[in-house]
Amino acid sequence: MENGHMNGVRTHHDRNSWTNGVNGGVAKREGSPDKGKAHANMSGSSVMMNGGGASFMDVDSQPPGGTKFNDLPDEIQHITADIMPLSLLLTRLSQWTHTKLQDEIAYLASKPLPQGVLNGTTNHQSADNHDTSQESLEKKVHLLNFLQDMHSKWVKTLVITEWSRKAAQVGALIDIRVHLLTKQAHYQELFWELIRMKQDLHWAKVPGPDLKTALEVLTTGQASWMPELGYIEPPPITWEEKEAFIDNINTMLSVRLTFDEHEKLPAAFRDYNIANGRVTFKVKGEFEVDLTIGDEDFEQQFWFIDFRFLFTPAPAELSHGVRTFLENKVNTILGDQGLAGCYNYLHEFVLTQKIIEFRRQATELAMGRWVDTLKVEKLNRAMSIQYWLKPPHGLEGPSSQTAKSWILLGVWSGKGVEGDLDSKPSSYISLRWFRDNKEVKDFDIPLNVETISAEKLLTAVIASHVEYILRSISSKLLSKPRFAQKHARLDLEISKEEPQNSSLAVQLFDNDKAVIKIEPLTGFFTMFPRSPVFLKGQMKLNTSSNVAEEGANLMEQLRFDHAVKDLNSRVRSIGWFVCRPPITQEETKTIVYSDASGSREAFKAVWLRKANWMTRQWFVMISMSLGGDQWWLVDLSPPKPNFPAGRLRLFTKMPMTSNQLTLSDTFFRNLSVYAAGMISHITDLRKLHTLKKSHTALELPNHSLPPQVRLPTIYVRLSEMLQQRPGSSSRTLTWAKDFVPIIFKGVRSHTGDQEGPADATAVRRDTPASIRAEARLTVIDRNKFKSLRGNVDHDVVYNHRTGQFSLKLRADMGTPVVDLLADRVQALERLMEFVEAIRLAGSNAIPQSVALREVVFTYSNDPAEPVVGPPQGPRAWNVHLDLPKDAKVVLTLEKGNPHIRALDMLQDMAQSTKTELLPSYLPFSLPLYRVLDRIEDEWESIAAKNAGNVAIVVKAAEWVTVRFTLPAPTTRRLLCLDIKTMGRKGRLLWHVKRTDEKGHERPLNAPQDEFDTLLQRSVWHAHGDGRKTFGTSAAADPKVGIETLLWSISESVKSLVGTLPPPPGTSPHPGGGTQDLQQGPQKTPQEMVAAQAAQAAQAAQAAQGMPPQRPKQQPPTPSQPQQQHRNVNQPQAQAQPQLHTQVQLQQAQVAQLQAQRQAQARANNSSNNNNTFVNRAHPGQPPQQRQSGPQTQAQQQQQRYQIQQQAQAMQRMQQQQQQQAAQQHAQQQGQGPQGQRSVHGQAGPQGVPQGQPGHGGGANGGMGGKNAPVVVID
């Protein structure tokens, strides 16, 4: 009967069992209706014992001390197994019925409705109005079957319920029957036990001895009581008969095995041999069996002859007892099962013998060399060998289970789990390996069952276990970036035969490696080389709970311990030392895990610092992990009182890999250089970033550093590094390229030891180190620096071949080098300004010594032609310029130098923006100052006699004042001369003119004195010797003319020494003495100016290549007498010169105003070309550049053409103004006749007749009064 099911839902029905049911439990219910069969004394609370008449449903519980069922004896055991309470049956059945009913309702609801119902056309033709559609009929049939099935089940339950009223009696009957069956079984077992005992005693039965027969047989050789049967012995068999008989048997065996037994022959028996009347079946690696036949009938069985083992070690022959047993057994099987049964039996027999041999050898090993390391256990046709009884890496402890490893060797039946035949046709010996309490499904351990060796098998298993452990550690390490990226070597050697030869070598540093081996007998780890660090790591491996998983981390810990130990012992001699972590672990993680490309493996940090680093906040940190070793350069802020440890300020990763960790002196010297270079690099970049300077970094070859050290080169803009010079709007150097590389050159201690190459001397720990760097400035034009020698300074070298300046920079550790670069470049720029100025000076200035802090050169005037006049002094003078780093330039002149009187002015010029003009100015002004010295020396004797003196005042570089003073009784006899520069026709000349006592220009109407007459006679009209005269002034060439000019003035003034001044109304006679002012015609100052202008115009025409024109006058006509001509010249000539003088004064004022404005504009643009001489007196002329060499003919022609064009334009403008002024004057006087205009001359192409007094118009205008040229050097 089915018990139903709960459908997975737990109910709260009563689960208590009846007394006669499960667990001896009881259940309670109301009494069932009495059908006349119940006892009168039964109630709902009656207790049912064994054999009681009440039903299980009427039993509540058994009261304590109640009687047993029917008072059965104690020998009868009460049966309670496999009995369930009736309530459980009813509950389960009701639940199952309810579930089935729900399923049935759902099923009927899922059935399709009748077609008529769907269409709305129900069939109403039936008399009983029942639905007779096919769908309804199927539902009804299905429901009827379900109800019939349920009805049958509940009827059966009803029958069981009725029988439950007699449950006590039935239970007692069951107990009695079981008791009787048990006794019957005892009797049968005893019977068979007696039979077996009788059979066993048969071998112990000894028959009684027949001594009489024995005595007769032993003495006579026969027994008289034995009857003679009279058998006739057959004739002996000959050899031919034997061979024929054997051949016959061989033939029958061959025929039988070929035709009759071919299909029945097992596959293992395919290898057989027929000879000597027997067939020998050979199963490789197992056995050989000899069989024969006893009858020609193929239906008869084979017979056993002999058996031999084919595996070793095995007995050569079977014992008599075993042979007899085997023969009987095999013959029986051959008779029943044939050859297949024979093979199966012998195959199983051999497998069992092999297992026995394995067990025997293992037992001997456990009692011999492998004592206390093996445990052999005998099983049914199987055995187990447990090795490494006390594994060092197992789980130890009261609550943990020791990891065990063993092999299980047994006979496998060859059947699958479900009983199907496996791929192997027969059973075989299988090997199962359990490693650390887990079975290994896939392994490659050779099992040799032909040559049995338990030791080799065990060695192979242990070798595989050792391989598993070492390979697990190796695989774990290889999965980490440090070994996956070949940053460290990992050598795994595996030996399948000798586990002690298997090893794992892990590289620690360079040649240092740790070799791990496992002792095959005990399983203990051994580590080489033998040292305290390795012994500690070996102990950790032996106590690990899971070496395969934790071995990689343990090896990394070992590497860190070894590294710290070696660093402490090696780096101290090189100046490094290991220090404590200056920051917390969390800050260290911030550094290590900042690399996005790195892994987040657990790491150990080693902090190093150089002893001779002046700064105490730079560290080198090594983060060692399986993710790879990383080297970091860390900068910490100074410690604070509340936070003693330094705070993290900057860190950068050093591009070094683990294979560079050689822990040698060479490596740490290179590390010192590299770290110092990085510190210098970072410090410079930080400084440049703070100053907001443009910069970049490129990695270029640096042969000053070891090949292993590669540092980037910083490029900066030279224009940004230079400070703004006073008075200059540009910071760009014109002589050097703008980009300057700063190349790191190594580290040098203050004692001079270099920490660069590997063979450098070791630096003392207490010796401060400094950074060495080099900045290279590439010049644009190498020809400008031919005068420089190799060593410009002790730390500045110029290479003529490459055209580069090498600036050696040295700074303390942590100090920016760019600050020194700016200072050196400024000093070098100042030097180059002097060198360029000396070069532009040409042959007049020759450099003698050029250094960064000192420049010495010689200068001279180098006249083009010999000077006639005063005696010449030395032609070359030395100038010494001291260029200190932070102080002003100091200019030193040798004794006797004519420029000593202008030393202060020269000193100021060297400090100003006109420094580059100094080398050109000195030879330019040397003749001037030389003649001034001569003049001053010449007048010393005169001054000593109080006959006169001379005073020379240097007001500016282009302005010198000379005052000649002669004694006079009433008035001062004073001649003041201004000597200034002027530009003319592209040349710079010295212009000498007379001024008043206060230095102002003399008015045009000033009375003429003795000095004017003297200068007009002997100076202002003298030509040649490099002089140009302008009537009231003169200009002289700076090389050959200025000395002659000034000397002639000095000699002329000396001629007045000792003479008396002329009386009033007289003027000095040209030949000496005085002349009356009333005698003869006297020229007014205006007439003199006009005459000078005419002379200047003639000079301009001569310069332009035009022939001089004589004054044009109309010849006198008869109608015009001579007196009229004189009258015209007398009264009207007085107005005409005055008018023309006013026009010239206006022109001079306009020209001077324009010259001042243009000079001011050019002064503002003077920074564009500091070597330009600006002519402020002639604004129409362009600024003239100093020529570095002689001009070509084309350049001279072009320059001459420009000057002519400018002169003609100036002349035309002046003539037009003069013509307009003359017409206006004529209109005012009312003179219209042609004859009067002819007095002035005919108007020609030049506008005004040349040569007329007061109408001269040169190309350069007048040179007197306010229109006198003023030339300055800018």
UniProtKB/Swiss-Prot annotation:
Regions of compositional bias (Pro residues) in chain numbering: 1108-1119
InterPro entries documented for this protein: Med14_N, Mediator_Med14
Source superkingdom: Eukaryota
Bias kind Polar residues: ranges: 1075-1085
Predominant cellular place of this UniProt entry's protein: nucleus
One cellular component (GO) term of this entry: mediator complex
Pfam families linked: Med14
Region (Disordered): 1-40, 1056-1142, 1155-1274
GO biological process: regulation of transcription by RNA polymerase II
Known function: Component of the Mediator complex, a coactivator involved in the regulated transcription of nearly all RNA polymerase II-dependent genes. Mediator functions as a bridge to convey information from gene-specific regulatory proteins to the basal RNA polymerase II transcription machinery. Mediator is recruited to promoters by direct interactions with regulatory proteins and serves as a scaffold for the assembly of a functional preinitiation complex with RNA polymerase II and the general transcription factors.
Protein name: Mediator of RNA polymerase II transcription subunit 14
Underlying gene: rgr1
